[in-house]
């Protein structure tokens, strides 16, 4: 494709779209992800962790 990037890590992440590569695997359910931050967010579905709270109401 014609996409260009200023950083090599952005290119690496983009290439995964074309190749379908998903190198990050959840150890609990074995689901695979192309990005580590997506895996981190997914793991919270297993742990129930909710690290962000509203400053106004505390929920």
From Swiss-Prot:
Protein name according to UniProt: Early growth response protein 1
Record's comment describing the protein's domains: Binds to DNA motifs with the sequence 5'-GCG(T/G)GGGCG-3' via its C2H2-type zinc fingers. The first, most N-terminal zinc finger binds to the 3'-GCG motif, the middle zinc finger interacts with the central TGG motif, and the C-terminal zinc finger binds to the 5'-GCG motif. Binds double-stranded target DNA, irrespective of the cytosine methylation status. Has reduced affinity for target DNA where the cytosines have been oxidized to 5-hydroxymethylcytosine. Does not bind target DNA where the cytosines have been oxidized to 5-formylcytosine or 5-carboxylcytosine.
Signal sequence coordinates: none
Pfam families: zf-C2H2
Compartments where located: Nucleus; Cytoplasm
PROSITE patterns: ZINC_FINGER_C2H2_1 (PS00028), ZINC_FINGER_C2H2_2 (PS50157)
Chain ranges of zinc fingers (C2H2-type): 1-18, 24-46, 52-59
Site (Interaction with DNA): 3, 7, 13, 31, 35, 59
Keywords: Activator, Biological rhythms, Cytoplasm, DNA-binding, Metal-binding, Nucleus, Repeat, Transcription, Transcription regulation, Zinc, Zinc-finger
GO CC field: cytoplasm; nucleoplasm; nucleus
Gene that encodes the chain: EGR1
Membership in a protein family: Belongs to the EGR C2H2-type zinc-finger protein family.
Protein role: Transcriptional regulator. Recognizes and binds to the DNA sequence 5'-GCG(T/G)GGGCG-3'(EGR-site) in the promoter region of target genes. Binds double-stranded target DNA, irrespective of the cytosine methylation status. Regulates the transcription of numerous target genes, and thereby plays an important role in regulating the response to growth factors, DNA damage, and ischemia. Plays a role in the regulation of cell survival, proliferation and cell death. Mediates responses to ischemia and hypoxia; regulates the expression of proteins that are involved in inflammatory processes.
Transmembrane stretches, start-end: none
Keyword hit for Zinc: yes
Chief location of this protein within or outside the cell: nucleus
Keyword Transport: no
GO BP, sorted A to Z: cellular response to interleukin-8; circadian regulation of gene expression; interleukin-1-mediated signaling pathway; positive regulation of DNA-templated transcription; positive regulation of transcription by RNA polymerase II; regulation of protein sumoylation; transcription by RNA polymerase II
GO molecular function, one term: hemi-methylated DNA-binding
């Amino acid at each position: 494709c014609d996409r260009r990037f200023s950083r090599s890590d952005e290119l690496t992440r983009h290439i995964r779209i074309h190749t379908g590569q998903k190198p990050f695997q959840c150890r609990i359910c074995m689901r695979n992800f192309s990005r580590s931050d997506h895996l981190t967010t997914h793991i919270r579905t297993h742990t129930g962790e909710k690290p962000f709270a509203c400053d106004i109401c505390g929920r």
